[in-house]
Design a protein with these regions (language model features):
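Short, low-complexity N-terminal intrinsically disordered segments enriched in polar/charged residues
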Residues: 1-27, 31-32
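An acidic, carboxylate-rich microenvironment
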Residues: 28, 50-51
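A short gly/proline-enriched turn/hairpin at secondary-structure junctions
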Residues: 32, 36-47, 59-62
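A general secondary-structure boundary signal
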Residues: 26-36, 108, 119-121
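A beta-strand edge to alpha-helix "cap/lid" segment located at domain peripheries
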Residues: 2, 54-129
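C-terminal ligand-sensing/allosteric alpha-helical core of TetR-family HTH transcriptional regulators
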Residues: 13, 52-55
Length: 129
């Protein structure tokens, strides 16, 4: 299989999803996922939209605020690739904000190409040492 990627502006569904995380609202922005989306972020293996929503909320609630920035977005139809940076600011202001790079692959659903069926991504590292 061959895929041809086109660099584009990020779609609204992607911006909405990141905004839900940044705002800590975890609402309709997650509607971009199918009910049974599989998400592999680093060591995470989450199955289903509600598991993704719940686990990301739990992770964010560990004591920081995130702000996602889109650097690049590439579209090959069934596969979308996102590269960016996330500012991770600790709730305890004595800690420093880190800015890890992130890369995400979004595989779209065969039956509804407006929905993500698989999400594979990596963020970080957030520190060395």
């Amino acid at each position: 299989m061959q895929a041809v990627f086109t660099k584009k502006e990020p779609p609204q569904w992607l911006l909405d999803m990141w905004k839900e995380i940044d705002d800590k609202t975890f609402g309709k922005g997650f509607d971009c996922f199918t009910e049974d989306t599989v998400c592999n972020l680093g060591v995470a293996d989450w199955k289903g939209r509600e598991a993704i929503r719940g686990n990301l909320k739990t992770f964010i609630d560990t004591g920081f605020t995130a702000l996602h920035h889109v650097t690049e977005y590439w579209d090959a139809g069934f596969l979308k690739v996102f590269h960016g940076v996330v500012d991770m600011t600790p709730d305890d202001r004595s800690g420093r904000t880190v800015h890890p790079t992130m890369t995400h692959f979004f595989y779209m659903d065969e039956k509804d190409d407006t929905k993500v069926r698989r999400w594979v991504g990596a963020v970080g590292p957030t520190a060395f040492g």
